[in-house]
């Protein structure tokens, strides 16, 4: 009469920890295997990261340059902020202007801000 899986599991559940350790050692010897955890695969290298192109970007104002007023106007247009909020945002550079936007919108916003005199980064 062969034991079912449930019978084996119930027998193991009733064993002490020392008995289970001995059982594992005996299984390793009998089957020529080890119960050690396999090493995790290495993280993907830069080539794999480059293959996965981002689809969401954060537009970050790095600095406002010499044309602060023009940059404030461009930030107001892009974000819909009021004058004071846009001014505070520009003066707190580096600061995120928009977060989680698609590539086309991020590139367009970067172009507008750079035309206004700002230094912009896409992250």
Swiss-Prot record:
GO terms for biological process: translation. GO terms for cellular component: cytosolic large ribosomal subunit. It holds the Pfam family Ribosomal_L12_N. The keyword Cytoplasm does not apply. The keyword Ribonucleoprotein applies. Coiled coil: none annotated. One of its GO terms (molecular function) is mRNA binding. InterPro entries: Ribosomal_bL12 (IPR000206), Ribosomal_bL12_C (IPR013823), Ribosomal_bL12_C/ClpS-like (IPR014719), Ribosomal_bL12_oligo (IPR008932), Ribosomal_bL12_oligo_N_sf (IPR036235). Keywords: Ribonucleoprotein, Ribosomal protein. Forms part of the ribosomal stalk which helps the ribosome interact with GTP-bound translation factors. Is thus essential for accurate translation. Homodimer. Part of the ribosomal stalk of the 50S ribosomal subunit. Forms a multimeric L10(L12)X complex, where L10 forms an elongated spine to which 2 to 4 L12 dimers bind in a sequential fashion. Binds GTP-bound translation factors. Belongs to the bacterial ribosomal protein bL12 family. This is Large ribosomal subunit protein bL12. It comes from Psychrobacter cryohalolentis (strain ATCC BAA-1226 / DSM 17306 / VKM B-2378 / K5). The gene is rplL.
